[in-house]
Amino acid sequence: MLGMIKNSLFGSVETWPWQVLSKGDKQDISYEERACEGGKFATVEMTDKPVDEALREAMPKVMKYVGGSNDKGIGMGMTVPISFAVFPSDGGSLQKKLKVWFRIPNEFQSNPPVPSDDSIKIEERESITVYSLQFGGYAKEADYVARAAQLRTALEGIATCRSDVYFCTGYDPPMKPYGRRNEVWLVKA
């Protein structure tokens, strides 16, 4: 676990492969259109809890799996970003449900270790095209909701995105105080 934190703060981590298809800027909102590769992901689903609370419970499970709590007892190293799917309600607030997605590192894509925790599932995910808006700070549910609304407004008349789900992402460990990177991803319809 300390190795993962050290690498996240001072070293390099594997980035989820994507290709920037285009960049845009509208209403002071700069965004990218990206084609994100699919692959195998470790997932944890949480329900009946607000997003921030659900994340505090789900993230340690994923970190333990990545750190070696698996059938092979090996630490895999981090990939970024860690993303979580959120599900909007009418009016823009979020349902009490989320799904954390951690992309298995390339070295383990063909044969990922089996999680020791039964609540973690290994799932194959297709590639997706997203519109991404980056922002800093310690992101909370309200920040993601606000940024998603800004991005939707900026994309009006330009792109059609799914309204039933979007992704919130983080690139940094919780103890990194400055230069934090978060993104909201709207999925192209």
From Swiss-Prot:
Keywords: Cytoplasm
Superkingdom of origin organism: Eukaryota
Cytoplasm among keywords: yes
An annotated GO cellular component: cytoplasm
Entries under InterPro entries matching the protein: Reg_factor_effector_dom_sf, SOUL_haem-bd
Transmembrane domains' residue ranges: none
Main location: cytoplasm
MF GO annotations: heme binding
Family matches, as Gene3D superfamilies: Regulatory factor, effector binding domain
UniProt key word RNA-binding: no
Subunit note: Monomer.
Family per similarity comment: Belongs to the HEBP family.
Its job: May bind free porphyrinogens that may be present in the cell and thus facilitate removal of these potentially toxic compound. Binds with a high affinity to one molecule of heme or porphyrins. It binds metalloporphyrins, free porphyrins and N-methylprotoporphyrin with similar affinities.
Name of protein: Heme-binding protein 1
Taxonomic source organism: Sus scrofa (Pig)
Gene this chain is encoded by: HEBP1
